[in-house]
Amino acid sequence: MSSKRNSLMLPLRIAIAGASGRMGRMLIEATLKEEGAVLASAFDRPGTTFIGRDAGELSGSATGILITDDPRAAIAAADCVIDFTRPEGTLAHLALARELGKAMVIGTTGFSTAEKEAIAAAAQAIPIVFAPNMAVGVNAVFKLLEVAARILDDGYDVEVIEAHHRFKVDAPSGTALRMGEVVACELGRDLETCAIYGREGVTGERKAETIGFSTIRGGDVVGDHTVLFAGIGERIEITHRSGSRMPYASGSLRAARFLAGRSSGLFDMQDVLGLR
């Protein structure tokens, strides 16, 4: 799909979905600074204020690339589309990427099980990196959680605490859920049956094999995640705090480069970073 482009050392052409959103703006800025990549297109929903305006307005410098409401044309102009929108939008863009034979990096969260299966099915035709968090630091934390869970085993209660800005629409965050999945897998548990999402009233004693989730929403918090291993007489906390969205954008571009030259397959950031 893009092996010829790579062999000729041409820059990787990037399309940004949801261009006027918080992540879209950061992705535009990161792409403009990225060596070996060019902003090929940027698109958003019809009626969005920035349609028809230069994508560079969102990052402070003119680019000559106008934000469009035509996703087909935008995706056709690129080698890879990066999408941090909403599940319904991402799935529509995925269908176009599959039809046009384009790679895709998906950072959207909040998918149902059936929607995740649709992404996996599309990956039989095109290469996809699908991950709840593209930041290198968060993915390092996933590995640390594997090690901690393996060492601590069943002797510690596990709680996942996450905080995000007031505008986030899904809870718990995809990153928090992935952290819970990592720990549950290492402990031989099924997160779907052992997860507890919030507590209220007279709950009784904590069941030993549960994994609890607590969600905070407020202000402009970019993203904080802590996994607490609470034992008798000691506690271990593994925390990641995001100060900006740039690590997500930089990781997404790294994922796009990883997909270059691949014809199909479903990958995550553990694959991109060689942590498998």
UniProtKB/Swiss-Prot annotation:
Q: Which residues form the active site?
A: 164 (proton donor/acceptor), 168 (proton donor)
Task: Output the superkingdom of the source species.
Answer: Bacteria
Task: Offer a single GO CC term for the protein.
Answer: cytosol
Tell me which EC number(s) this protein carries.
1.17.1.8
Q: Where does NAD(+) bind?
A: 18-23, 44, 107-109, 131-134
> What GO biological process terms does the UniProt entry carry, in alphabetical order?
diaminopimelate biosynthetic process; lysine biosynthetic process via diaminopimelate
**GO MF term (any one):** NADP binding
Where does it reside? Answer: Cytoplasm
The reaction(s) annotated as catalysed by this protein in its Swiss-Prot or TrEMBL entry are: (S)-2,3,4,5-tetrahydrodipicolinate + NAD(+) + H2O = (2S,4S)-4-hydroxy-2,3,4,5-tetrahydrodipicolinate + NADH + H(+); (S)-2,3,4,5-tetrahydrodipicolinate + NADP(+) + H2O = (2S,4S)-4-hydroxy-2,3,4,5-tetrahydrodipicolinate + NADPH + H(+)
What the entry lists under Pfam families is as follows: DapB_C, DapB_N
Can you tell me which residues bind (S)-2,3,4,5-tetrahydrodipicolinate? 165, 174-175
CDD domains from the UniProt entry: DHDPR_N (cd02274)
Described by its record, this protein's role is as follows: Catalyzes the conversion of 4-hydroxy-tetrahydrodipicolinate (HTPA) to tetrahydrodipicolinate.
Family the UniProt entry places it in: Belongs to the DapB family.
PANTHER family in UniProt: 4-HYDROXY-TETRAHYDRODIPICOLINATE REDUCTASE 1, CHLOROPLASTIC-RELATED, DIHYDRODIPICOLINATE REDUCTASE
Protein name per the record: 4-hydroxy-tetrahydrodipicolinate reductase
Q: Which organism is it from?
A: Aromatoleum aromaticum (strain DSM 19018 / LMG 30748 / EbN1)
